[in-house]
Regions:
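N-terminal domain-start signal
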Residues: 1-206
């Protein structure tokens, strides 16, 4: 890596080092594991870097799924900080890395539709992307079928690859070809973003 590249990443490196310092220690995780109930666990987390994510509301205290959803918001906010402080030529790659959570959400939504779950049951199993543009997941669930949900992905990066996958979905009566198409789409777009980096950065990234 050249001196100019090192300088370009200095700011984001400092931010990441600070985030590493906020990670829970093994000892803290062991203490949290010993908590007798969710309310006690949340109270203990109030002493950690997750405090801002877990206001002691009824929703988080009563539901471990909701508590986990709120905790995951911290990762979204940390990603945002990293992206904002990264060199401009690397930001779209970092955004694409973050979109792996969108991929997981998309597959979870399609699985939920397949088994007939409603939006209220699905929504807090998803990764919270907060301010980042994402797919119309609530509308997809409300559409009622996998086919109609995929139709709502018109004019998105997924459309071209999901059309042939939908044919296989009907033929095989399985979501597997759809999920494979989603994964391949993601990794191809990630590879394309790597190709936009400076040559030396491409070598390191690969």
């Amino acid at each position: 890596m050249t001196l100019s590249s090192v300088s370009a990443y200095a700011n984001v490196h400092t931010r990441v080092r600070g985030m590493i310092g906020n990670l829970l220690s093994d000892e803290t995780i062991a203490r949290l594991s010993a908590c007798p109930d969710l309310g006690t666990l949340i109270a203990k987390l109030d002493e950690t870097s997750y405090a801002s994510c877990l206001a002691a509301s009824e929703e988080t205290i009563k539901s471990s799924r909701r508590a986990a959803y709120e905790i995951r918001k911290k990762l979204t906010r940390d990603y945002k900080i990293i992206i904002e402080h990264a060199p401009s030529f690397a930001r779209q790659l970092l955004v694409q890395l973050f979109r792996l959570y969108e991929v997981d959400n998309l597959k979870a939504v399609l699985r939920g539709i397949e088994v007939g779950e409603d939006w209220e049951k699905i929504r807090y199993t998803l990764f919270p992307v907060e301010d980042y543009p994402t797919l119309p997941f609530a509308d997809m669930v409300q559409s009622g079928t996998v086919e109609s949900a995929i139709a709502l992905l018109h004019n998105t990066d997924y459309e071209v690859d999901l059309k042939p996958a939908l044919t296989r979905y009907h033929d095989e009566e399985s979501l597997f070809p759809v999920e494979v198409a989603i994964d391949l789409n993601y990794w191809q777009r990630l590879w394309d973003q790597i190709d936009t980096l400076p040559k030396q950065d491409q070598k390191i990234t690969r």
